Amino acid sequence: MEFLCLAPTRSFSTNPKLTKSIPSDHTSTTSRIFTYQNMRGSTMRPLALPLKMSPIVSVPDITAPVENVPAILPKVVPGELIVNKPTGGDSDELFQYLVDILASPVYDVAIESPLELAEKLSDRLGVNFYIKREDKQRVFSFKLRGAYNMMSNLSREELDKGVITASAGNHAQGVALAGQRLNCVAKIVMPTTTPQIKIDAVRALGGDVVLYGKTFDEAQTHALELSEKDGLKYIPPFDDPGVIKGQGTIGTEINRQLKDIHAVFIPVGGGGLIAGVATFFKQIAPNTKIIGVEPYGAASMTLSLHEGHRVKLSNVDTFADGVAVALVGEYTFAKCQELIDGMVLVANDGISAAIKDVYDEGRNILETSGAVAIAGAAAYCEFYKIKNENIVAIASGANMDFSKLHKVTELAGLGSGKEALLATFMVEQQGSFKTFVGLVGSLNFTELTYRFTSERKNALILYRVNVDKESDLEKMIEDMKSSNMTTLNLSHNELVVDHLKHLVGGSANISDEIFGEFIVPEKAETLKTFLDAFSPRWNITLCRYRNQGDINASLLMGFQVPQAEMDEFKNQADKLGYPYELDNYNEAFNLVVSE
């Protein structure tokens, strides 16, 4: 049976029906542990719910945003399979897909990418862990397959008119390359927030770049308008049978390269890649599990399979921007319902750890979305203690924005469990800091931030340590507690990882102070636009911003807002249009900054 538990975090008025997918009949004695998750994908506190698994019910598809779709999904245990019960599908249609996949001309532009045994991962997990290296393609991504397959089936008349698409990433390069090969003008509409390196890459492949809109949705709307106005064929990034079949050629290669595969793990954004690979495998090697992998903060396919129809996420975490899709495709969703075995969710720190794993294997750096499937496959093997099986994960791309590497590095050690981020509250007295260092003992410091302040009794120390064994870390925390030094493990709290170490030095003791995290676009005028909305009406007490090499960035703000003005403040924040969460949604952060 299929299931997914949705649990509310505190009280969010924008998501009043967050619990609608929790079965009302909680009579089962089976108790499962889930955790809250905020809009960033950070771990919150655990929630135990007795669950009775409920089947997916078929309901009409939707194409518009759904207001009651939660922006916050619970964390199932990383690597745990969220089961989908395949419904089958029309055998004649599936067979035609298979024929078209086998006859696809994608090798006019694509190579048969290598399937490489990851020896270090294999040794660590006790399996034969293979990585399908789609990052080795000319455009460093699998996306050229689907774009070329669809475009190669257009008539010469359609090609002569030209094609158009909207993309800020790998699909744009795939369409540009296909247009170059087919002697066809390829117009690519990209948001004005697109990094220059990606714009230059598309132009280098002959793409006619049109910069329009601040978001992908605005760029896509403009592309569709130009398609209608100028008679240009629109090339969707995933939701077209031609695109799906092109991506499905990866399945034929994996099947040629390796037999007796336990499971193939596939990153899921809009669903084109997994739909294509599943269509091939479930007809040729049906015993091989086809498992999709999504980030917790962009789990649109997972949620859609649970609901039985496509749903649109109101907020999407863009850390793995290549799979940050709010609404999966109509064709792709149908194929996933019919064919795949389930979904696995991964956190941003797990994705970062997977990037490091691939780097350790052969000094290659994947983009964040390119490592999603590897993170999911590793977590699945660890959760189910899989041994001596053939495991395949698709490395879908390597178009890493260089400025994002610092964030990946910050998270990688935490995601692998080889490093821990801790906060210790220590009574300010002579010799106490030396005592603290002694209690850390053999756990090697990798970073430490401490500043004496006379304004509060307890000092805050933020630090990272290397961890060989979890038991060593647990003992150290207990030793701290016995010495009256309360210690918190903040390793999976991304807000803390991003911001808190820069704020050590004491609370400001400001009356009516509230904190908020806003997810804002990375562009020049963002901060001014933001401040215009609040200042000088409310006093700014804190501001912390860091470019992440991403579509969006985290902006941490403090404001002085009297309680009587909170409704007015929230209305102003809502009008601004940026996803945000205020005050004490992140308990660990508030405990640390207010201590």
From Swiss-Prot:
Expressed in floral buds, 8-9 mm long flowers 1 to 2 days before anthesis, open flowers and floral organs including sepals, petals, stamens and carpels of 8-9 mm flowers (at protein level). Expressed in very early floral meristems of the anantha. Over 500-fold expression in mature flowers compared to leaves. Expressed in sepals, petals, stamens and carpels of the mature flower. In sepals, mostly expressed in the abaxial mesophyll cells and in petals in parenchymal cells. Not expressed in epidermal or vascular tissues of sepals and petals. It is found in: Plastid, Chloroplast. Induction: Expression is induced in response to methyl jasmonate (MeJA) and locally and systemically in response to mechanical wounding. Parenchyma-specific induction of expression in flowers and leaves by MeJA. No induction of expression by MeJA in epidermal, vascular or sporogenous tissues. Caterpillar (Helicoverpa zea) labial saliva induces expression in leaves damaged by herbivory. Keywords: Amino-acid biosynthesis, Branched-chain amino acid biosynthesis, Chloroplast, Isoleucine biosynthesis, Lyase, Plant defense, Plastid, Pyridoxal phosphate, Repeat, Transit peptide. Its EC number is 4.3.1.17, 4.3.1.19. Pathway: Amino-acid biosynthesis; L-isoleucine biosynthesis; 2-oxobutanoate from L-threonine: step 1/1. Threonine dehydratase 2 biosynthetic, chloroplastic: Strongly inhibited by 1 mM isoleucine. Processed threonine dehydratase 2: Not inhibited by isoleucine. The modification N6-(pyridoxal phosphate)lysine is found at residue 143. Residues 420-492, 514-585 form the ACT-like domain. Residues 1-51 form a transit peptide. Threonine dehydratase 2 biosynthetic, chloroplastic: Active at alkaline pH. Processed threonine dehydratase 2: Optimum pH is 9. Has little or no activity at pH values below 6.0. It catalyses: L-threonine = 2-oxobutanoate + NH4(+); L-serine = pyruvate + NH4(+). One of its GO terms (biological process) is isoleucine biosynthetic process. Belongs to the serine/threonine dehydratase family. NCBIfam families: ilvA_2Cterm, PRK09224.1. This is Threonine dehydratase 2 biosynthetic, chloroplastic.
